[in-house]
Design a protein with these regions (language model features):
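Membrane-embedded transmembrane helical bundles of large multi-pass transporters/channels
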Residues: 17-211
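Extracytoplasmic
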Residues: 1-12, 47-51
Length: 211
């Protein structure tokens, strides 16, 4: 479509609006046309949102970690224990992100939100273990390992039942008509399971080493 000194071209993609092929085509069009061309439409909007989201994703995580650490430092009886909590949850997040290869590729929305959501959902497990450990230390003075062993047993009993309901809630997302639901559901359900495992393995080890 031509008018005066401007030309408008309509481009139709064979794939869906947010498909990888469509987004790659938008990138290619922009690289060929340069700054003299303005690309609009849903595919270009999705591509812009994807780029912006991936740029800001690390900032989301940093803000979440800082705010959570401040709250824990103010409410816990130790300023050091929040660091152990963050290290434990951080390892769980890394394991969760690393095991996403089984799905081939995950949505950029899931990738941007998964870390923050996993931190918010699983940090409670660490708090429960810590308080249980403190109670058992009073019952087993001078024997931290025995106190931690009992605390882990109590934590497993309470946390597993709680995590099952959380996992079930995330798996319910898999029944959404949008693929994002299944994507987010699987990643977050897996993240909760890994979070529980790290809570009863990694965190107790760190606490015993530094206590």
């Amino acid at each position: 479509f031509n008018t005066d000194n401007s030309t408008m071209m309509a481009v139709f993609f064979d794939e869906a609006t947010s498909a990888d092929g469509s987004l790659e085509a938008v990138k290619e069009i922009r690289s060929i046309a340069g700054e003299q061309c303005f690309v609009s439409g849903m595919s270009s909007v999705v591509e812009d949102i994807k780029d912006l989201t991936m740029q800001e994703a690390p900032m989301y995580v940093v803000i979440a970690v800082i705010l959570t650490s401040i709250i824990l430092a103010l409410t816990m009886d130790s300023f050091l224990i929040p660091l152990f909590f963050m290290l434990s949850v951080g390892m769980a997040i890394v394991y969760n992100m690393g095991t996403n290869f089984i799905q081939g590729e995950i949505s950029f929305i899931t990738e941007a939100l998964a870390a923050v959501l996993q931190l918010a959902v699983t940090i409670d497990y660490s708090i429960f273990l810590w308080h249980s450990y403190k109670e058992e230390k009073e019952k087993h003075p001078g024997d931290n390992k025995e106190a931690m062993a009992v605390a882990i047993g109590k934590t497993i009993t309470s946390v597993v039942s709680s995590s099952i309901t959380t996992v079930a809630g995330f798996l319910a997302l898999c029944f959404m008509s949008y693929e994002l639901g299944m994507d987010m559901g699987i990643v977050m359900a897996k993240g909760v399971v890994i979070g529980v495992i790290c809570c009863i393995t990694v965190l107790p080890s760190m606490i015993l080493v530094f206590d």
